[in-house]
Regions:
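Alpha/beta catalytic barrel-like cores
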Residues: 8-105, 109
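Generic low-polarity alpha-helical segments
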Residues: 1-8, 16, 161, 197
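Metal-centered catalytic cores of metalloenzymes
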Residues: 310
Length: 328
């Protein structure tokens, strides 16, 4: 594919992944035509998931701790403050109570979340709060959540977040390009976003609740990967419908297809409405079955979440003590 512009100097570089970064490929409409999705088969596959594969009790705690390390701990509220962001960063550095980690034999291991995700206004605050922790800051960008600001404003927003120290940028695509089948426009937009990010990794939010069909989800995913997305992400968390297992299966199969065609590994991030520990186990099972162990690590799997962490902590406490503390 065409080479990308040189990376910009960067203050908070992501640790290099265990695999090469997705460089993208030249736009090829035939790849989009090839995206075939069988809705009823996908729904059947997902419906049988909870009964077909259960994670054994002892393994559950390990899987949930792994989920914590893949979490983008997030606050995206209109009433966010610097104080709230600093508290979130403190939690990201120590997401699970020390006594629980000791009981699980993980006291030495220093568990932390995959990233902290905030609005651009709070990037510098989060970078300062996380200094020395190795936890990257992810900024949502490009006129999130609707993505309807002018293109040059989107690029400037990305560049400012990167210069403030964001190591990851979660962008939103223009849904109209998907709904009208204007795939070249989507590709060009995504290519520009990737270039503006420089060394920062880019997660493409497909807003799957807005683009309506699984076929659209599949095609939008493929176009964003062709244009160099490091991750594809289900949702902003602001749509009426957020992450679902059926949409997830569709996106995972596109990741696998793209990897088969190019050799590039692209990450996956479900987001929005994932608040129960038992739900995240289903996502993990699907990831493992569709893509394998490589997609269990934070360089290829992230979970967008705010309230999920509290439930995971409750489940870990139950695992250790046999009882639940009061849900606060």
């Amino acid at each position: 594919g065409p080479s990308l512009p040189p990376a910009m100097a960067h203050s908070n570089v992501v640790p290099p992944p265990r695999h090469g970064r997705n460089a993208g490929v030249a736009f090829d409409p035939s790849w989009i035509e090839d995206c075939r999705i069988n809705l009823s088969a996908s729904e059947r596959r997902v419906a049988t998931l909870p009964g077909r594969r259960t994670v054994k009790k002892d393994a559950q705690a390990a899987w949930l701790l792994k989920a914590v390390t893949c979490m983008d701990l997030t606050t995206l509220a209109g009433d966010d403050t610097a104080g709230r962001v600093r508290r979130l960063c403190a939690k990201a550095m120590r997401p699970v109570r020390a006594d629980l980690l000791e009981s699980l034999g993980m006291g030495e291991r220093g568990i932390r979340t995959g990233a902290v995700c905030v609005y651009h206004r709070f990037v510098a605050t989060a970078v300062a709060a996380l200094a020395g922790s190795g936890i990257p800051v992810a900024a949502i960008s490009t006129g999130f959540p609707a993505g309807l600001v002018p293109h040059d404003v989107k690029l400037r927003e990305i560049e400012e977040s990167v210069s403030d120290g964001a190591a990851e940028i979660d962008i939103v695509i223009t849904r109209e390009h998907v709904l009208t089948g204007n795939w070249k426009a989507l590709y060009d937009e995504m290519r520009d976003f990737r270039a503006a990010c420089g060394q920062a990794h880019v997660k493409a939010i497909l807003a799957t609740g807005d683009i309506r069909t699984l076929r659209n989800v599949a095609r939008a995913a493929m176009v964003c990967m062709m244009a160099g997305a490091d991750f594809i992400k289900t949702s902003t968390g602001k749509e009426a419908t957020n992450a679902t297992l059926t949409v997830t299966l569709t996106m995972l199969r596109m990741i696998r297809d793209y990897h088969d065609r190019t050799g590039f590994k692209v990450g996956f991030k479900p987001a929005g409405g994932i608040s129960a520990a038992k739900d995240i186990l289903n996502y993990q099972i699907l990831m493992k079955e569709e893509l394998g162990r490589d997609w269990f690590e934070p360089d290829l799997f992230r979970i967008g979440a705010s309230s999920l962490l509290a439930d995971i902590e409750r489940q870990l406490e139950h695992h250790v003590t046999g009882r639940y503390s009061a849900s606060n």
